[in-house]
Amino acid sequence: MQFIDQANIILKAGKGGNGIVSFRREKFVPAGGPSGGNGGKGGSIIIIADNNLQTLLDFKFNREIFAKDGFKGGPNKRSGASGENTILKVPCGTEIRDFNTGIILGDLTEDKQSLTIAHGGRGGHGNAYYLSNQNRAPESFTEGKEGEIWEVQLELKLLAEVGIIGLPNAGKSTLISVLSSARPKIANYPFTTLIPNLGVVRKADGNGCLFADIPGLISGAAEGVGLGHDFLRHIQRTKILIHLIDSIAENPIRDFEIIEKELKRYGSGLLNKERIVVLNKMELVDENYLQTITKKLENLSKKKVLVISSSLRKGLSPLLSEVWKRI
């Protein structure tokens, strides 16, 4: 499935129904009073969060969305029916912004949480509304009001509690696959992961925690190089970041610094998030070299560095223990 995590759409609520001019003309009431009913309210557009959705793909080609108009009033003071509301379902974690001003209109983080964006127009008045002592036979009516029009930007930010970050080929996909039931595409070349992978990791008590393998970040990601902005946004909601470093990379220290620099440049408090620094692929390097790199990383990060092998499933228990302590 294609992953779409941002969409710009135009929402147009329904117009209110018109009021009508009508007079009672019953057999025994030859000169009855005004009886024109009011028009119905136009339909509104309501956005609802749905736990079963994981992408904004539905809006890739459907960029203009309408609600139904209200119906005109009827005789005998009957009001017109309201226009049907249009319901848009989005994944939990969808933020809604005014496209023109950037103002956040809503942030739907829980299942079934809803937000009415475009309100339907009010129905017009029929002539019965204008009856008064001064005017016993009014012929006035009003048309329904136009519905609201909004241009909005939908932006999905994953609701994972733990984000796994690192340069391409650091082993993020392998790690999430062995920790959870996720089955991401894995290969020995950079940029295998083009969309965030999600996996539920179970604690001993059976409760689950959602992990996200954030696609490989590169230098310049904070300025949008590669798909930097698209991927960094998904880190914002996480509670903890696992910074995974490839021990067989040409320069693991430089790799660590690249990601830290991008977190700082992107802002939004990313650099202040809890981070666990992890050196991966321990089985592929000499023990002395591993100790040297570990010590350098600890001095640089001011944190204890964990050493693991995702493919051999070594060092994973201490890693998860650190995660559970921080959530």
From Swiss-Prot:
Gene3D superfamilies, per the entry: GTP1/OBG domain, P-loop containing nucleotide triphosphate hydrolases
Domain annotation Obg: ranges: 1-159
UniProt-annotated binding residues for Mg(2+): S173, T193
Catalytic activity, EC: 3.6.5.-
Signal peptide per UniProt: none
UniProt entry tagged with the keyword ATP-binding: yes
OBG-type G domain residues: 160-327
Entry's Gene Ontology molecular function annotations: ATP binding; GTP binding; GTPase activity; magnesium ion binding
UniProtKB keywords: ATP-binding, Cytoplasm, GTP-binding, Hydrolase, Magnesium, Metal-binding, Nucleotide-binding
Location in the cell: Cytoplasm
Reported cofactor(s): Mg(2+)
Function per UniProt: An essential GTPase which binds GTP, GDP and possibly (p)ppGpp with moderate affinity, with high nucleotide exchange rates and a fairly low GTP hydrolysis rate. Plays a role in control of the cell cycle, stress response, ribosome biogenesis and in those bacteria that undergo differentiation, in morphogenesis control.
Name of the protein in question: GTPase Obg
Species: Prochlorococcus marinus subsp. pastoris (strain CCMP1986 / NIES-2087 / MED4)
